[in-house]
Amino acid sequence: MFEKILVPVDGSETSWKAMEEAKKLAEAFRGEMVVVNVIQPYNNAALLVVPLDQATISQGNEELTKIGNSVLETAKEKMQDFKGKKEFLLEVGHPSERIIAVSKEKACTSIVIGSRGPAGTAEFFLGSVSSKVSQYASVPVLIVK
């Protein structure tokens, strides 16, 4: 079950806790880890309340990509002591959908995910990501508080 663990990280404290738990499991079972950050791009459909021009949307998406890469760099630093095989991915799309898709694409045997994302207005939304992943994933899901 822990031969290849997918760990979504978003920079929140719970995602780092999930990564640490996944690391322990991977070490104990001599497994691999796939660490993923999913950015959800801006588009006009998502911004119906305040329509923005394409240049502003593109600039926002570039910033999201920078943030996603920064989260993955932090993950790489935190994973330096892990001796097993590890992979780091930046994905674009709806978080729960991409997490489930990556788990299939990479033939992961389990998912270890934090229970909530960053605090603030996104907290409810990101908490629903772990809920959707646990409901629709085809592999076992461990939710870390």
What is each PLM-predicted segment?
Residues 54-69:
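A short acidic, glycine-rich active-site loop
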